[in-house]
């Protein structure tokens, strides 16, 4: 594959541009931005090419067309390569001269003026023509637009006449177009487009912590969540004034000053916080003082030079913070602390009881007291729950019908009659326990669940302890318990043997429990210390009393008044409930008949007449239900009129809550996240359904035990369509449209194939670079997700822009749907593919690769040394090989150029993240090309080098980029070097590869670098074998993706393992007549080799002999103990004296 075809996949070009010329302008300020302006007849926007200083990215602004900048030295001028067929030479003074020459990806001859004049002078003419032509076109367009605007204005406002100039008046609105002021809106140019300022909170409101909020109507600071005891707030901030300068505020706080502070301020008294200005104080000015010790939950005190508030009890959510002074601080401010009354002490004691008893609703301070109390329940009677009909289908109710959590249990009467029908002396029994709802009994199918029944309800049957039942077996006199149900046919007689002593004992226990519960309820419910003197109504909080006094009475004081009876109300909800009494509309309708009622209790009494054989019958489908709640729910769900219509689709619902739930389908918000797989859902029930279906234990176990079966491979395309695809598998003769499809194919079918063997997968990924604008403000983001988060946070309720992936193509006459996305294409970015070190998968970002490793290779995710850090070095080959001739002067062979250098840095950046890890051996083939007037010549020598990738400790730290701004103007200072052969000798390392050595490879501490020159032999130095390292051996991977340029670089990775490298050099000439002497070395690489080969050849010209290295004898003891395997022999040939070295620079 030649370079033109390969680059066209990355940089798409058009065939019609082959003969077009272009002018290039370099921006003098930066030196890294080049603007390409085409000079042909076609009208095309200019292209701006950015080549960053660190070589990290490439950007083209013109959209679908791409332009890549290559810089090449040609005798004091740089060549800029754009699309094929467009070449411009950039001179040292940042000016350009156009040229229409075909590009063969080789070194081009320098520009010479035909008449011998300065080439810079010929440049100014086309540039001047182009600029003049552009100015003329702009002037014509402006004149045309101005004429059209004037014609439109004349037709719209023919009768308008300008007003005479008005004197300055602050109430007039200035119009710049009219150069005059107007009383209101300008009659010609219309109103202005105002953009208001953002509202800025005061300092006091802006400093409010996130766990607190200020009530907008009542004032005061309230808690959003539970705040534990001993939580400190503060310090209080505000101006300090004297006591005589204090203004009205919630609480007065005094600050004690030291003697030094008083002398500085020239004061003779302490200062007070003035907490009345929101712009000077913080949020603590809104905390109101407590009126008694019961409502106090904060204490104020001074610590150092500041005043703090600390919670003295747990603050519950939606509870107001109330503060008062500490004991010592109260004396300092001449205030008294709140005294605790006996009733308040009882309430506080009850609040401190955090250990509840679930048998009798009592609470205790410690777990020991609760355990002692639970022991007393062993002697009490247990009550069986009576059986009832099925409920609403949501499981068993915990607190019985009609009782909400937190409400006291109901008292149920139990009548006990003897066998002869007479009532016993015990009369009625009060039970604190209320039964739980169970299944309906067959004898009692229908109940008015949820309705108030006028008759006495069915009574549960008590059960005595086992010891009591055993004692009753010897008693002759027994009693029979009879229930008093609502209907006589549903009486359930239950026989139980109870003596009179047992019944009296049970009654005494129940009375004790009842008295304890009543006392507990009195303390919590009936303590109302704040009473209204006008009507006698009492409240538990002073704020409630103040609110009641503010709207006391019926005339004039209440904000809301009934128009019919002049009754006053303090809330709209109370007024709406009251207005139902004056309306003729019956709110509560019976589902079985046309009757309607204005009160719910009347409806509850009415529906009992519709019971037929113990069941309620649906009036529409004749389905029977044993419970009224069930039939009511059935009618409302299936037979109600669907009056709530969805505005997005054709669905309708009978209830507004169902419509709100359905509207989540049309929204973009997904607030429910699956913690297992990360999938998001709009509704909680869908998340629950996903968890049950996808992440249940049975499915996970079946998925883990599933055996992967290989499917038979069937090619999907014919061989004729194979060449039309960009990404191809050459083993299967199969083509793919996208890179990811080829990667997935290789991972499944060819897992042993390496990425370096597939040229298509080494190409960079071209991704569009977009700006995402917020249509509600001036924010710009680089991703749609960040813009979406910004809109949801700062513009709640605003409509989100549509996603680019969900846009449908515009029809005829329709606007471009991309206009509604509020995005703009700013160019493209070439990013390197990031390869997984454990499989053939590759991704566009390192983040996705890390996620892949955590999911597919969890055993490697925990090992920090598995993921190798990419090398930060590159080989910049920039020294020419000097061909030594018989004459004194040497002819320089141009072995590299700035084009290759720029491509080196670009590929260095593109291949940073998937470079070969340490321990792999690579071969680099370097083919230099010489420059002459007759054109290109054949390569004069070839160098091969085998190196190991390792870190370097270079004494000279180079700059970040080797393509500098100054080199664009003057390429001469940049040195050029040729690759120097590095002969590597091995220290005393055992040749038998172990399992650990096979993983680590040849360590840099076991090899030593040296240079081979003419007439020298490699000598072993035993004292330098330890702690030695190899430098100048850094090579980037995947150079085969940039073939066909003037300097071709190819890579080959040898199989991993423990290798032994030896050298034996001979002097062999390559050509005759020009080369005086050439050094040739043979590298023998063997895996687990027992004996090192030594090869010596005689020089064909010059008779120079290079002796074998001396370190081979030290490795002889292990000759007979190892088994010889495959060998890799690579010949290295060097022209010249071999004195130059490879320069290693960091990008």
UniProtKB/Swiss-Prot annotation:
Coiled coil segments of this chain: none
Residue spans of biased composition, Low complexity class: 1118-1140
MF-aspect GO terms: DNA binding; DNA-binding transcription factor activity; methyltransferase activity; zinc ion binding
Residue ranges, annotated region (N-terminal PR domain): 227-331
Acidic residues: bias regions: 133-162
Zinc finger (C2H2-type): 355-377, 530-552, 560-582, 588-610, 616-639, 644-666, 672-695, 727-750, 772-795, 834-857
Positions with biased composition (Polar residues): 953-964
SUPFAM superfamilies listed in its UniProt record: beta-beta-alpha zinc fingers, SET domain
InterPro entries xref list: PRDM10_PR/SET, SET_dom, SET_dom_sf, Zinc_finger/UBP_domain, Znf_C2H2_sf, Znf_C2H2_type
Biased composition (Basic and acidic residues): 472-490
UniProt keyword annotations, A-Z: Activator, Disease variant, DNA-binding, Isopeptide bond, Metal-binding, Nucleus, Phosphoprotein, Repeat, Transcription, Transcription regulation, Ubl conjugation, Zinc, Zinc-finger
Top-level taxon: Eukaryota
Stretches the record annotates as Disordered: 1-20, 110-168, 387-412, 466-499, 953-973, 988-1031, 1088-1147
Entry keyword annotation includes Metal-binding: yes
Biased composition (Basic residues): 387-407
GO biological process per UniProt: methylation; positive regulation of DNA-templated transcription; positive regulation of transcription by RNA polymerase II
Residues where Phosphoserine is found: 424
Disease per UniProt entry: Birt-Hogg-Dube syndrome 2: A form of Birt-Hogg-Dube syndrome, a rare genodermatosis usually manifesting in adulthood and characterized by multiple fibrofolliculomas, trichodiscomas, and acrochordons. Patients with this syndrome have an increased susceptibility to develop renal cell carcinoma, lung cysts, and spontaneous pneumothorax. BHD2 inheritance is autosomal dominant.
Family recorded in the similarity comment: Belongs to the class V-like SAM-binding methyltransferase superfamily.
Function: Transcriptional activator, essential for early embryonic development and survival of embryonic stem cells (ESCs). Supports cell growth and survival during early development by transcriptionally activating the expression of the translation initiation factor EIF3B, to sustain global translation. Activates the transcription of FLNC.
Name of this protein: PR domain zinc finger protein 10
Organism encoding this protein: Homo sapiens (Human)
Lineage: Eukaryota, Metazoa, Chordata, Craniata, Vertebrata
């Amino acid at each position: 594959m030649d370079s033109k075809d390969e680059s066209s996949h990355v940089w798409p070009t058009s065939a019609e541009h082959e003969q077009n010329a272009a002018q290039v302008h370099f921006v003098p300020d930066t030196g890294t931005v080049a603007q390409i302006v085409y000079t042909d007849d076609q009208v095309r926007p200019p292209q701006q090419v950015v080549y960053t200083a660190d070589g990290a990215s490439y950007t083209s602004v013109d959209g679908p067309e791409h332009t890549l900048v290559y810089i090449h030295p040609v005798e004091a001028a740089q060549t800029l390569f754009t699309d094929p067929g467009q070449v411009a030479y950039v001179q040292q003074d940042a000016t350009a001269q156009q040229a229409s020459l075909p590009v063969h990806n080789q070194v081009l001859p320098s520009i010479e003026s035909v008449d011998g004049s300065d080439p810079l002078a010929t440049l100014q003419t086309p540039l001047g023509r182009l600029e003049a032509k552009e100015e003329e076109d702009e002037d014509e367009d402006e004149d045309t637009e101005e004429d059209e605007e004037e014609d439109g204005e004349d037709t719209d406002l023919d009768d308008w006449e300008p007003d005479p100039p008005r004197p300055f008046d602050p109430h007039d609105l200035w119009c710049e177009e009219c150069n005059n002021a107007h009383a209101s809106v300008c009659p010609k140019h219309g109103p202005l487009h105002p953009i208001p300022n953002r509202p800025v909170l005061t300092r006091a409101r802006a400093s409010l912590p996130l766990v607190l909020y200020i009530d907008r109507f009542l004032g005061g600071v309230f808690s959003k969540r539970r705040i534990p005891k001993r939580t400190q707030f503060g310090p209080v901030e505000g101006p300090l004034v004297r006591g005589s300068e204090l203004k009205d505020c919630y609480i007065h706080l005094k600050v004690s000053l030291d003697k030094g502070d008083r002398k500085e301020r020239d004061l003779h008294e302490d200062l007070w916080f003035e907490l009345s200005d929101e712009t000077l104080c913080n949020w603590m000015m809104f905390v109101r003082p407590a009126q008694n010790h019961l409502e106090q939950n904060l204490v104020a005190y001074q610590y150092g030079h500041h005043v703090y508030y600390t919670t003295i009890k747990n603050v519950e959510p939606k509870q107001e913070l109330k503060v008062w002074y500490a004991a010592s601080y109260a004396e300092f401010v001449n205030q008294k602390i709140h005294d605790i009354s006996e009733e308040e002490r009882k309430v506080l004691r009850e609040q401190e009881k955090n250990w509840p008893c679930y048998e009798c609703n009592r609470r205790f301070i410690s777990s020991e007291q609760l355990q002692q109390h639970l022991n007393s329940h062993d002697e009490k009677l247990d009550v069986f729950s009576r059986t009832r009909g099925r409920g609403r289908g949501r499981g068993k109710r915990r607190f019985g019908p009609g009782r909400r959590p937190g409400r006291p249990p109901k008292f149920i009467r139990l009548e006990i009659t003897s066998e002869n029908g007479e009532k016993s002396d015990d009369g009625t029994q009060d039970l604190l326990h209320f039964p739980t709802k169970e299944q309906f009994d067959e004898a009692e199918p229908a109940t008015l669940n949820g309705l108030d029944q006028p008759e006495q309800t069915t009574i549960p049957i008590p059960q005595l302890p086992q010891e009591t039942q055993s004692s009753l077996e010897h008693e002759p006199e027994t009693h029979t318990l009879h229930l008093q149900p609502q209907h006589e046919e549903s009486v359930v007689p239950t026989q139980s043997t109870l003596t009179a002593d047992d019944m009296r004992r049970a009654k005494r226990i129940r009375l004790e429990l009842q008295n304890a519960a009543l006392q507990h309820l009195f303390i919590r419910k009936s303590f109302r210390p704040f009473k209204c003197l006008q009507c006698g109504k009492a409240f538990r909080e002073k704020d409630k009393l103040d609110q009641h006094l503010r709207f006391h009475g019926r005339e004039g004081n209440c904000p809301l008044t009934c128009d019919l009876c002049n009754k006053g109300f303090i809330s709209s909800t109370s007024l709406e409930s009251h207005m139902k009494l004056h309306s003729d509309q019956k709110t509560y309708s019976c589902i079985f008949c046309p009757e309607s009622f204005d009160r719910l209790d009347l409806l509850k009494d009415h529906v009992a007449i519709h019971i037929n054989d113990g069941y309620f019958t649906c009036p529409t489908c004749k389905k029977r239900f044993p419970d009224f709640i069930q039939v009511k729910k059935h009618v409302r769900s299936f037979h109600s009129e669907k009056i709530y219509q969805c505005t997005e689709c054709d669905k309708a619902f009978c209830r507004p809550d169902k419509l709100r739930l359905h509207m989540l389908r049309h929204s973009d918000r997904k607030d429910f996240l699956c913690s297992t797989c990360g999938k998001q859902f709009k509704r909680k029930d869908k998340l629950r359904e996903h968890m049950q279906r996808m992440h249940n234990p049975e499915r996970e176990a079946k998925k883990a035990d599933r055996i992967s079966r290989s499917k038979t491979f069937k090619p999907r395309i014919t061989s004729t369509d194979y060449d039309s695809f960009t990404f191809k598998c050459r083993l299967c003769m199969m083509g793919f449209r996208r890179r990811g499809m080829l990667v997935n194919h290789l991972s499944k079918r060819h897992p042993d194939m390496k990425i370096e063997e597939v040229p298509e997968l080494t190409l960079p990924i071209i991704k569009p670079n977009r700006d995402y604008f917020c249509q509600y403000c001036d924010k710009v983001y680089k991703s749609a997700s960040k813009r979406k988060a910004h809109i949801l946070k700062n513009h709640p309720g605003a409509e989100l822009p549509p996603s680019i992936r969900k846009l449908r193509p515009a029809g005829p006459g329709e606007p471009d749907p991309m206009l509604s996305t509020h995005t703009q294409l700013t160019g493209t970015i070439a990013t390197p593919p990031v390869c997984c070190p454990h499989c053939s998968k590759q991704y566009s970002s390192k983040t996705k690769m890390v996620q892949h490793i955590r999911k597919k290779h969890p055993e490697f995710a925990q090992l920090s040394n598995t993921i190798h850090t990419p090398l930060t070095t590159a080989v910049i080959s920039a020294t020419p090989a000097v061909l030594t001739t018989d004459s004194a002067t040497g002819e320089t062979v141009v072995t590299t150029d700035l084009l290759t250098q720029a491509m080196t840095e670009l590929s260095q950046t593109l291949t940073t993240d998937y470079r070969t890890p340490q321990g792999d051996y690579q071969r680099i083939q370097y083919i230099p090309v010489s420059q002459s007037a007759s054109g290109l010549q054949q390569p004069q020598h070839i160098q091969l080098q085998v190196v190991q990738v390792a870190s370097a400790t270079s004494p000279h730290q180079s700059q970040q980029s080797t393509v500098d701004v100054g080199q664009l103007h003057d390429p001469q200072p940049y040195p050029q070097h040729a690759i120097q052969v590095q002969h590597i000798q091995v220290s005393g390392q055992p040749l038998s590869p172990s399992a650990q050595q096979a993983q680590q490879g040849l360590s840099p501490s076991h090899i030593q670098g040296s240079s081979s020159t003419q007439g020298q032999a490699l000598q072993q130095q035993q004292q330098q074998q330890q702690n030695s390292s190899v430098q100048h051996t850094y090579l980037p991977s995947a150079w085969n993706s940039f073939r066909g340029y003037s300097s071709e670089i190819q890579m080959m990775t040898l199989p991993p393992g423990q290798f032994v490298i030896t050298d034996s050099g001979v002097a062999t000439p390559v050509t005759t007549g020009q080369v005086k002497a050439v050094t040739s070395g043979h590298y023998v690489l063997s895996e687990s080799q027992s004996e090192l080969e030594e090869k010596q050849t005689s020089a064909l010209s010059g008779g120079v002999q290079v002796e074998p290295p001396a370190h081979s004898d030290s490795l002889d003891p292990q000759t007979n103990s190892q088994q010889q395997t495959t060998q890799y022999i690579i010949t290295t040939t060097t022209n010249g004296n071999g004195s130059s070295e490879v320069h290693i620079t960091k990008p």
